[in-house]
Amino acid sequence: MFQFCLLILLLAPGRFFSALGKPQETLTVENREGSDSKAIPTCREASFCAFLQINPIDSNLDVLPTCTCTGGTTCSHSWDPNDGKSITEGHRQFKFCSNVLDTIKHECSAEEKALTGIFEEDKVTKIHLAYYGFLHCICPDHSDYPENSYNETETVEGDKKIITEYYHCEQFKTCKSDDTCHALAIGETKKIYYKDCNCPEGQTCPFELNSAYKTEYKETTDKFTTYSMRCQ
């Protein structure tokens, strides 16, 4: 799940649940501007700075910052599809430090690279250092960045391991009996929803937490319990 998903976090589609970043044993990340603290890193050029989601769990707006804008610019955490600095995809919105590049403003084709996620971690301790996300196009309605849609490369730079994932947009498939139809990540301050497939006709994907077939506890930029659901 971009699922940023934010990220970001718990997020990766699947891993972007890969909007929330990779599971880590610490909440600390290194600030790329050099101030050691628990601040998120500074943004790279053209990376999105936050992931917003109107979650169907309670209809609240959840915000997952991914990086800090530079040059006195702030990253808006308000839902606004018309501010020039946002890409909206259904119930989620990506925020940018500056106006969205024109090269992004088109619907993704089936073969097009839609999203790039770059994870930095300490190569020895595996502690998460940073996440940078880059959109290349707009994922159309009824589509997402499924976990099995990405290619991954790993490189080492000094004491850091760099994991780069390239995602494609795919239309939601019909769930099979043993598929996760959606997952709910419930944190101390945020609730994140990630849809994985459409239930067959006559079935629904539950939101009641006691219906989960699997639960998993993770610590990233927050403490989350993830509830995975199957169609009923």
UniProtKB/Swiss-Prot annotation:
Keywords: Disulfide bond, Secreted, Signal, Toxin. It is found in: Secreted. GO terms for cellular component: extracellular region. The lineage of its organism: Eukaryota, Metazoa, Ecdysozoa, Arthropoda, Myriapoda. Belongs to the scoloptoxin-11 family. It comes from Scolopendra alternans (Florida Keys giant centipede). Contains 8 disulfide bonds. Residues 1-21 form the signal peptide. This is U-scoloptoxin(11)-Sa3a. Expressed by the venom gland. GO terms for molecular function: toxin activity. The keyword Transmembrane helix does not apply.
